[in-house]
Amino acid sequence: MIRLPLALALIVVALLLPLAAAHADGIADTAEICSACHGPDGKPVDPSIPVLWGQNEGYIYLQLRDFKLGNRTNPVMGPIAASLEKQDMKDLAAYFAAKPWTNLEQPRAPSDVALHAETVASSAGCKGCHLGNWQGDSVTPRIGGQGLSYLRETMAQFRDGERKNNPWMVALLKTYTDADITAMASYLAGQ
């Protein structure tokens, strides 16, 4: 069931996308379309939508490219990315990466949940790519402080093979239980 704010955002995007393609005067105008879902202040309108403000530039570009190529699927992002040229994707990635990270003010995980998550992360080597502070690097996403629902859904999609644009993550998360995913999402969201 689509939540009301998400449904409204989808309607706004559907109405504005053709106008943006025809009349965009710059990347800030194009980015306004993104704000219908990802939020005008960097806080997404729905918990299942990721924070873009302050996300790593290379990662944003790769995701837009994957949506455009069909390597990553989403009924909203697929058509949006399909309308973008390579330079548009690079410009959008730079635009959002330059914004300050949005603090969603999510609570820290309880100590037992944090311990479970740290154990899972250590055994899987998560910090090898996402780094010690969960900030990622150029092409690896920042996941510390990302939305709880988005984190949980994304990890489950990788584990279940629904999201395939990163074969390493599919293989890594294949062994995660629901409890592991819930603990990791709670822990990461509160970072």
Feature locations, PLM:
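Positively charged n-region of N-terminal signal peptides that target proteins for export
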Residues: M1-L4
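Sequence/structural segment immediately N-terminal to covalent heme-attachment motifs in c-type
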Residues: H23-K43, L104, R108-G132, G147
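Gly/Gly-Pro-rich "capping" loops immediately C-terminal to redox-active cysteine motifs
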Residues: I27, G42-R72, G78-S83, E118, ...
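Inter-heme linker and motif-flanking segments adjacent to c-type heme-binding CXXCH motifs
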Residues: K43-P44, A98-D112, N133-P141, R159-N166, ...
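C-terminal capping alpha-helices of c-type cytochrome domains
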Residues: A82-E105, S149, K174-Q191
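Bacterial N-terminal signal peptides
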Residues: A7-P18
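C-type cytochrome heme c attachment motif
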Residues: T30-P40, L62-R65, K90-A94, S122-L131, ...
